[in-house]
Amino acid sequence: MELPRLENVDLSGKRVFLRVDFNVPIENGKVTDKTRIEKTLPTIELLIKKGARIIIASHLGRPKGQTNPEFSLAPVVEVFKGLVKSNVYFSKTVIGDEPIKLSKELRDGEILVIENVRFHKEEEENEPGFSKKLAALADVYVNDAFGAAHRAHASTEGIAHLLPAYAGLLMHKEIVELSALLAKPARPFVAIIGGSKVSSKIKVLNNLFDKVNHLLIGGGMAYTFLKSRAVPVGNSLVEKDFEVQAFQLIEKAGVAGVDLQLPVDHIIGDQFNEKAKTKSVDKMGILDGWMGMDIGSKTVSNYEKIIKNAGTIFWNGPMGVFEMDKFTGGTMAIAKAISKSKAKTVVGGGDSIAAINKAKVADKITHISTGGGASLEFMEGRKLPGVEALKKKVSE
């Protein structure tokens, strides 16, 4: 069943509960990257054009079910106000008298943003009573929060059973783009998977084996693979409990005819911080007392050749310790190589997107996915609760 679409629905004068993903990075009370806010604007502009009265809900960070000013949406609302032409109001509470009163006072095309839904533990518990209180604010539900679609929470799943429910434009685009990757990718299909832990990527790697032609591994997870092949990795991050599974993945790739590539050289550091001394080492391995912090120039060159000839590219996860300036080189090189490729390109995950933005090549990428965890779970072949709920009839 296809997702129910917004475009042909009459929403004039109706209150629309719009779940978005405004989970943006904030430093010293200021939003440092507004990409996720900007990505929802087409849906918001469509709702304004339709004369809807919009109630926006989002989570921000992990306040653990308690009100915590550090995770307030107030600074996000200030940025959001500068991106839309409509009147924007802010409710300092999620449920109760204030949001109900403000939602009833909205005029067509006006927007109310309610406070962080995760200030209530019932949100993450998907507690039915809390879902009902959210649903009481509106007549219609729209989910545009693909980044939270893998969570069965009250504002992403529970409420969808209580109101007529639709997919927002961003949600629909994400599902279409990622579905096409799995269904009919142009060949060769290259997946570039990085990040620190192999444990968090095992399922997606397993699901990709019968779909991709090349699998390029980077980031901290590469050292668990290398250790499983008896390559010296010094003090690098290794998940000992996953060495056997990493070795089995290498074997499985061989059987499936997938070209699985691991780093052949490394930028290493003598400590895990910005003050680390650094050097480059190749296939002899990493010395004791040193740790792998980024892929080396030979690895970059190997990966660039494969990327250049790709028909489809999926990238999730950095090639090194991207949060430290000394070790961003590999990730930045991959970002630039992908941007020069003629392939269809899909990028997901916070650090990968940050590298694309830092390299100023976002306009060269076919699709930048707003959901790190959600896009990975989708690529694992799993059903996303927030998406499945949109396909169901409203509870009587």
Swiss-Prot record:
GO terms for biological process: gluconeogenesis; glycolytic process. InterPro entries: Phosphoglycerate_kinase, Phosphoglycerate_kinase_CS, Phosphoglycerate_kinase_N, Phosphoglycerate_kinase_sf. Pathway: Carbohydrate degradation; glycolysis; pyruvate from D-glyceraldehyde 3-phosphate: step 2/5. It holds the Pfam family PGK. It is an enzyme of class 2 (transferase). It comes from the Bacteria. Its EC number is 2.7.2.3. It catalyses: (2R)-3-phosphoglycerate + ATP = (2R)-3-phospho-glyceroyl phosphate + ADP. It is found in: Cytoplasm. PROSITE patterns: PGLYCERATE_KINASE. Substrate binds at D21, F22, N23, R36, H59, L60, G61, R62, R118, R151. ATP binds at K201, G292, E323, G349, G350, D351, S352. GO terms for cellular component: cytosol. One of its GO terms (molecular function) is phosphoglycerate kinase activity. Its main location: cytoplasm. Keywords: ATP-binding, Cytoplasm, Glycolysis, Kinase, Nucleotide-binding, Transferase. Monomer. Belongs to the phosphoglycerate kinase family. This is Phosphoglycerate kinase. It comes from Leptospira borgpetersenii serovar Hardjo-bovis (strain L550). The lineage of its organism: Bacteria, Pseudomonadati, Spirochaetota, Spirochaetia, Leptospirales. The gene is pgk.
